[in-house]
From Swiss-Prot:
It is found in: Cytoplasm. Its EC number is 2.3.1.274. GO terms for biological process: fatty acid biosynthetic process; phospholipid biosynthetic process. NCBIfam families: plsX. It catalyses: a fatty acyl-[ACP] + phosphate = an acyl phosphate + holo-[ACP]. One of its GO terms (cellular component) is cytoplasm. Catalyzes the reversible formation of acyl-phosphate (acyl-PO(4)) from acyl-[acyl-carrier-protein] (acyl-ACP). This enzyme utilizes acyl-ACP as fatty acyl donor, but not acyl-CoA. This is Phosphate acyltransferase. It comes from Thermotoga petrophila (strain ATCC BAA-488 / DSM 13995 / JCM 10881 / RKU-1). Belongs to the PlsX family. The gene is plsX. The keyword Transferase applies.
Length: 334
């Protein structure tokens, strides 16, 4: 796997997200201190100028409640301009906390789909006991055909290899581990994954397996994947909140113990904090597009930009192209 070591250029949609533009600008400034390259601000000139970072003016806004087609209609919006810059090779990646529908449509229409990919998908690396598990689709395609789930598996395998997995194993998210569980489309997807992936396919997995690291890649339709992701985010917040309350209510000894274990607690909190893995790749398009959570604060935006940088340096688009081409042409598991 080739690693890019040169300076990168990442564009950020300053007007995308519930907390735009203030938190987006703060996050971009934080990221600029850690990323080896340029962060390019895209938004209305009166908002993005004099921030100490390069900028591109875009006076229109794709709002969070806008229908998907608005990204194509509003050609002077920060989202459209950013995707256009990416498609023209003027930036290496584009990050937005804007609405998923417009961003996804814009990525597939303006940046374009990779050859052989009918449905791009959202892929996110979530924390697990064994490091990270790739969840795909995390919310782009509510309804899919079984064949689309096979494409998701190929893309997820490539992403998992970028994260360091040597021989990623794939699981199909279902309501039970038995082969005959689930609706007909899931049963059909099971058979296709078994046929195309061979021993790489682990079989059905359940929601609790995602964070246990039972497999390296979890394949799901966008509805189920998004529910799983949001549930994990809520659980992470619950765990940290309960831990804080327990320490607070436990008296002096609990506080003393917490002080002695502060470094361990901080590491746990960082790993569980959804903001720490705050970016989701739109996989299957010809450029690196990262979707940040709509409610992202500065910390989450910083991490989303760093996710984009990692995707650039690990050549994730080329790895997906190579992985899909190799698996499909080799005949392995067919």
């Amino acid at each position: 796997m080739r690693y890019r070591s040169d300076r990168v250029k990442i564009a950020i949609d300053v007007m995308g997200g519930d907390r735009a533009p203030d938190e987006i600008l703060k996050g971009a400034l934080l990221a600029s201190k850690e990323v080896e390259g340029e962060i390019v601000l895209i938004g209305p000139e009166e908002i993005v100028r004099n921030k100490g970072l390069p900028f591109v003016s875009a006076f229109e806004i794709v709002k969070m409640d806008d229908p998907p087609l608005e990204v194509l209609r509003k050609k002077n919006s920060s989202m459209h301009v950013g995707l256009k810059l990416l498609s023209e090779g003027k930036v290496d990646a584009f990050v937005s906390a804007g609405a998923t529908g417009p961003l996804f449509l814009g990525a597939t229409s303006i940046v374009g789909k990779l050859e052989g990919i009918e449905r791009p998908a959202l892929g996110v690396a979530v924390p697990s006991l064994k490091g990270a598990t790739v969840l795909i689709d995390a919310g782009a395609n509510a309804k899919v055909r079984p064949e689309h789930l096979v494409d998701f598996a190929f893309m997820g395998i490539a992403y998992s290899k970028v994260l360091g997995a040597e021989n990623p194993r794939v699981g199909l998210l279902n309501m039970g581990s038995e082969e005959n569980k689930g609706p007909d489309d899931i049963k059909r997807a099971y058979q296709l994954l078994k046929e195309f992936l061979g021993d790489t396919f682990f079989g059905n997995i359940e929601g609790h397996d995602i964070n246990l690291g039972t497999v390296d890649v979890v394949v799901a339709d966008g509805f189920s994947g998004n529910v799983a992701l949001k549930t994990m985010e809520g659980t992470a917040k619950l765990v940290t909140s309960v831990l804080k309350e327990s320490i607070k209510d436990g008296g002096f000894l609990s506080l003393l113990g917490a002080l002695l274990m502060k470094r361990s607690f901080d590491k746990m909190k960082e790993k569980l904090d959804p903001r720490s893995y705050g970016g989701t790749f739109i996989l299957g398009v010809k450029g690196i597009v990262v979707k940040a959570h709509g409610s992202s604060d500065a910390k989450a935006i910083k991490h989303a930009i760093k996710v984009a940088e990692k995707g650039i340096r690990m050549n994730i688009v080329q790895e997906i192209e190579r992985g899909i081409s190799h698996v499909r042409n080799s005949g392995d598991g067919r």
